[in-house]
Each structure stands twice: as structure tokens, then as C-alpha cells.
């Protein structure tokens, strides 16, 4: 018998959460269907992103981890969703496997420049996933490695500043007490400059 993943789902009529159980396949199909809807809205501008290349759904302890990878004419939009104790949904999208730090853990969306104009739709996707799975909040920031000066996110007692300098991504941990920081050199960003 196939193991099922437990999650809470909000009932609008009853105004309460109910515990649901779905198979790994059903949960995966829900996520991919949601992503397909989002990408369908983008296809007029970026081509027809109708190829689902890879997918997986895994459970690690109390954390449910779902990953879908969509290819559009050779350009990849990798989307990962992690459900932390059903309290929040964090989604990361990044280009061509570029992974700067653990953006999933600190709640960031890494978006290819071609998709930035559709960022509001992607936020709706995250909120919808959070709502369906009974999460109390969704966490996200939208970053473009060639068009932002500074991004801020408060996380785990630190102010994390993501800084783009000379095509490199840096992570600064600012301690709130004395404002000292540690700068860590990230991976080179080769995303095209907009405009």
C-alpha cells in the first residue's frame, strides 16, 4: 500500500482546517498542475513551456519536499517547494541550475529575468499552494541577479543582505547588536542584463 502524505486543508464553508491524506503522486500532480497554469500565462512572451522534464516528491522527517523542473526551449525554470511543518511554504525558482546559497531555506524566489514581469502571478501560485496545504503563511522575495542593488530578508536573528557586486552575489550577515557583518563570496551570476 502506497504511503500517504498528511497535510491540512482549509475549508471555506466550515471556516476550519481538515486533515487530509494524499498519495505522493496526487500531491505532485497538484503542484505541477499549478505550475503549468502559471507557465501557461507566460507562454505568449517566453514561448510554449509545455515540457515537464523532471519531477520528484520526497519526505524527509517532518519536512515535505517537492521539486519540479520545467524546460522551455533549453532554458530551465527550476521550482522547488518546501513545506516546513505545514507552517509556511517557500518556493525558489532559478535559472539553469544556478543555486546561490540555500535560497530555499531563507525564503527567496530566484527568478530568471524573462519571467520577472510575471512575478505577481508566481506569488499567487505560492499563496495558493500555501492555502491549499493549510499553511499559515508563505515566505518569498523576488530577486534578479542583474537588476537589484540590495535585497533584505530578516531570518533567524540576522539581517541577511543579498548584494550584487561586479556580477558576483554576496551574502552579508548583519548582527543586530554591533552591526558587524561577514561577507561570503557567492557564485558568479551570468544572467543577461536587462534593458
What are these regions (language model features)?
Residues 2-70:
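Short amphipathic alpha-helix that is part of the acyltransferase structural core
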Residues 140-150:
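Conserved beta-strand-loop-alpha-helix junction that forms the acyl-donor binding cleft
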Residues 107-117:
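A short, internal acetyl-CoA/4′-phosphopantetheine-binding micro-motif in the GNAT/acyltransferase core
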Amino acid at each position: 500500500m502506497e504511503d500517504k502524505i498528511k497535510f491540512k486543508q482549509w475549508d471555506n464553508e466550515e471556516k476550519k482546517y481538515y486533515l487530509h491524506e494524499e498519495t505522493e503522486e496526487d500531491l505532485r500532480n497538484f503542484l505541477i498542475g499549478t505550475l503549468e497554469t502559471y507557465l501557461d500565462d507566460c507562454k505568449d512572451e517566453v514561448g510554449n513551456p509545455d515540457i515537464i522534464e523532471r519531477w520528484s516528491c520526497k519526505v524527509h522527517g517532518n519536512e515535505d519536499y517537492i521539486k519540479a523542473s520545467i524546460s522551455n526551449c533549453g532554458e530551465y525554470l527550476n521550482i522547488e517547494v518546501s513545506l516546513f511543518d505545514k507552517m509556511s511554504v517557500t518556493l525558489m525558482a532559478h535559472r539553469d541550475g544556478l543555486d546561490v546559497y540555500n535560497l530555499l531555506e531563507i525564503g527567496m524566489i530566484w527568478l530568471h529575468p524573462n519571467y520577472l514581469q510575471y512575478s505577481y502571478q508566481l506569488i499567487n501560485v505560492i499563496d495558493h499552494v500555501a492555502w491549499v496545504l493549510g499553511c499559515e503563511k508563505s515566505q518569498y522575495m523576488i530577486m534578479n541577479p542583474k537588476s537589484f542593488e540590495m535585497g533584505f530578508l530578516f531570518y533567524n536573528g540576522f539581517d541577511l543582505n543579498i548584494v550584487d557586486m561586479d556580477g558576483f552575489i554576496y551574502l552579508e550577515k548583519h548582527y543586530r547588536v554591533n552591526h558587524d557583518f561577514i561577507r561570503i563570496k557567492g557564485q558568479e551570476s551570468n544572467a543577461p542584463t536587462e534593458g
